[in-house]
Amino acid sequence: MVSGCCRLDMSSYVSVLVLCSLLLWGSNSQQEQSSAAQRCFCQVTGYLDDCTCDVETIDHFNNYGLFPKLQQLVASDYFRYYKANLKKPCPFWEDNSHCGVKDCAVKPCPTDEVPGLKPPGFKYTEEANRAHEEIDDCEKEKRLSAVDESLSVEAQEAMLKWNRHDDSADNFCELDDEESPDAEYVDLLKNPERYTGYKGADTWRIWNSIYEENCFKPKAVQRPLNPLTSTRGENEGKVFYNWLDGLCVEKRAFYRLISGLHASINIHLCANYLLKDTWMDKIWGHNTAEFQKRFDATLTQGEGPKRLKNLYFIYLIELRAISKVLPFFERSSFLLYTGNETKDTETKKLLLDVLLDARDFPLHFDENSLFSGDKKEAAKLKEDFRQHFRNISKIMDCVGCFKCRLWGKLQTQGLGTALKILFSERQIENLSESNQPSEFHLTRQEIVALFNAFARISTSVKELENFRTLLEKV
């Protein structure tokens, strides 16, 4: 009888096991069939670390308020031209990576197309810019990563006037790069940030140098999912975040800024991916598979959602900087000079509208939490902070894809300008309406970089909404 009971219990036990297995299989199957959006975004919600702001507040503020205004602003003449030297050699290692990247091969142009052999203004003429007429073989072979440096005659002449106007102002700082004969103005609207085919070991080397050498991290602590690490431990993520949580808020913020910038760049590449490339046309659009590879919690061992939350962190930092710099731009003596008085007035009105919106954001990052300890230690930490960021900006000259290099330079300078603003509160408060030299000044280059960089971050936040909708169908 006891034996029979045991057999009955064992039979019931087996039945329960089978039933549980079926339920578990069904649960896993249901999880696999659940929206891919949940795996990417379910953890990207609520409050951000070291902040009093939540993701949902940023989404609503950006997507339905600030984003469209920023897009209109950076499309204006003042903000669409950025001066960059894309020919500087990498200062850290010998770099020939751009020669080996697919679709980035440099082919010689016919002699009559080489700049300098014809009058300097030739490439800005109507003849040289007829996009749909006699296109030579060199043009047909234009690389995805090539930077379109052509400017109209009107734009070229306007640049000279803009420079003269800037030279008459009291420049707070002058970048050596702008004075280089290799520095050229680039039309950002002609060179959108998007997928170029630049990937693999070369890009890993860039980001590895940024994270490993400039984010205050000891070599003993392994960064999760580092593709250049030969051996990976199961607990590397836990060890890394235990180390990160133990840092002072300033160093932790530095890492999260770089991670957020990295995430933003990846989002742009996924949102503007080359989906179809034929001899007839190129089709660009959202690549959900690429997005999942970078941000799906399952595919990234939980890293993806952390990266996305860091995007919101850098958004808060740059938004705070823009709100703080309002006194600089609202002075009547400040002009967004392009030579077209009517458009310049309209652009400044739009700029002030953006700045006022930024000021009225309800849950700003509190920059007073940074560098608030012992004055001597805080000063040293701030200088370390600045030097590390300068190193990162230099690494941009090692990027093998010229279009990637362009946007890397712009976005690092934009973030650097935002940090400069946050560290200059007293100087900004002491600004006056007069044209007398002041301790705080932004050059045209810094202004263009600041707002274009923030527009890129704003676009990334908006694109998350688009990807969330697309992934709900996957």
From Swiss-Prot:
GO terms for cellular component: endoplasmic reticulum membrane. Enzyme activity is tightly regulated to prevent the accumulation of reactive oxygen species in the endoplasmic reticulum. Reversibly down-regulated by the formation of disulfide bonds between the active site Cys-99 and Cys-138, and between Cys-104 and Cys-109. Glutathione may be required to regulate its activity in the endoplasmic reticulum. One of its GO terms (biological process) is protein folding in endoplasmic reticulum. Its main location: endoplasmic reticulum. Residues 1-29 form the signal peptide. Its cofactor is FAD. This is ERO1-like protein alpha.
